From Swiss-Prot:
Monomer. GO terms for molecular function: GTP binding; GTPase activity; magnesium ion binding. Pfam families: GTP1_OBG, MMR_HSR1. PANTHER family: DEVELOPMENTALLY REGULATED GTP-BINDING PROTEIN-RELATED, MITOCHONDRIAL RIBOSOME-ASSOCIATED GTPASE 2. The gene is obg. Its cofactor is Mg(2+). This is GTPase Obg. Residues 1-159 form the Obg domain. It is found in: Cytoplasm. The lineage of its organism: Bacteria, Pseudomonadati, Pseudomonadota, Betaproteobacteria, Burkholderiales.
């Protein structure tokens, strides 16, 4: 299935039904009084996050989503039926923005999360509501309210734990296909990867994490060159970035250090928060480098690149070094989750301390 990560739709809620101005008509009841019912509520348009959907392609072709109007009220105090709601199923990770105001309406981060995109109009009152001691035969009624109408922009940010960075042909697709269940297209020409790929890496029966591979970046990507800039937003939710570098390019004139610096510069131009994420250096294609030259080439790269963070040496093709990298990622993600859990627990601890400082009469000490 084609991966679509952006779409524009129009959500149109139903109008509320009009209230009825009706009077009770019955034999031997000459002054039956008002009995006009209210109009029904207009249908609303909802979005629901569904983990079984991974693309916005359906919304490229179905752009207008209209809920039904509420029915008008009738006599005999009959209320109009409410209009049917429309529910749109979207991938987990979808951002929904109002195109007219720029307001972020929803960020669908959990399966089953439901949000109202356009609210249906309220039904109007029938004349039964206007009866009083001074107005025994009211003829006024209220029309239903119009439903909301919104132009919406949908953006999908994939929910991955680890994101892969690198130039085209750095070996990202080969790496993700070796360590996970993903099977991206792999070939010896640039931009083989044209859309993001997700792979689930199973460390054991109980532990796994998700890796996102995006099209390779080139210099000028932040200004729109190449393909990768379109998909950099998919890395914003990750907890770790792996910067994969081709240490043995086919073209001997290509400098791996210059290419690595170019990637980091593009990352910084695009988003400072993305640049500040934890980032590991992964030196790939060591199987192509003669064994006696490996240590020298790696040492020279790190020195010229001025890198002080974690470094991993792998061959995505043969799998050398991949196992050690996978377990290091697992430990890093576990530490991140532990930090998040501790941060969430802190307010509860402060609350407990405050409760212990209250005397028997309910006054704080």
């Amino acid at each position: 299935m084609k991966f679509i990560d952006e779409a524009r739709i129009e959500a149109i809620a139903g109008n509320g039904g009009n209230g009825s101005a009706s009077f009770r008509r019955e034999k031997f009841v000459p002054f039956g009084g008002p009995d006009g019912g209210d109009g029904g509520r207009g249908g609303s348009v909802f979005a629901v996050a569904d983990r079984n959907i991974n693309t916005l392609i359906d919304f490229r072709y179905a752009k207008k989503h209209v809920a039904r109007n509420g029915e008008n009220g009738r006599g005999s105090d009959c209320y109009g039926a409410a209009g049917d709601d429309v529910t749109l199923r979207m991938p987990v990770g979808t951002l929904i923005t109002d195109m007219d105001t720029g307001e972020l309406i929803a960020d669908l981060t959990e399966h089953g999360q439901k949000v109202c995109l356009a609210e249906g109009g309220m039904g109007g009152w029938g004349n039964l509501h206007f009866k009083s001691s001074t107005n025994r035969a009211p003829r006024q009624q209220v029309d239903g309210k119009p439903g909301e109408r919104r132009m919406l922009k949908l953006e999908l940010k994939v929910l991955a734990d680890v994101g892969l960075l690198g130039m085209p042909n750095a070996g990202k697709s080969t790496f993700i296909s070796h360590i996970s269940n993903a099977r991206p297209k792999v070939a010896d020409y640039p931009f083989t990867t044209l859309h993001p790929n997700l792979g689930v890496v199973r460390v054991d029966h109980e532990q796994s994490f998700v890796v996102a591979d995006i099209p390779g970046l080139i210099e000028g990507a932040a200004e729109g060159a190449g393909l990768g800039h379109q998909f950099l937003r998919h890395l914003q939710r990750t907890g770790l970035l792996l910067h994969i570098v081709d240490l043995a390019p086919f073209d001997e004139a290509v400098d791996p250090v210059a290419e690595a610096k170019a990637i980091v510069n593009e990352l910084k131009k695009y988003d400072e928060t993305l640049y500040d994420k934890p980032r590991w250096l992964v030196l790939n294609k060591l199987d192509v480098v003669p064994e006696e030259e490996r240590a020298t080439r790696v040492k020279d790269f790190i020195k010229r690149y001025k890198w002080k963070g974690p470094v991993f040496q792998i061959s995505a093709l043969t799998g050398d070094g991949c196992r050690e990298l996978i377990y290091a990622i697992k430990d890093h993600l576990a530490a991140l989750k532990a930090e998040e859990a501790a941060a969430l627990a802190e307010p509860d601890i402060r609350l407990d301390e405050r409760l212990h400082n209250v005397d028997h009469d309910g006054h704080e000490q």
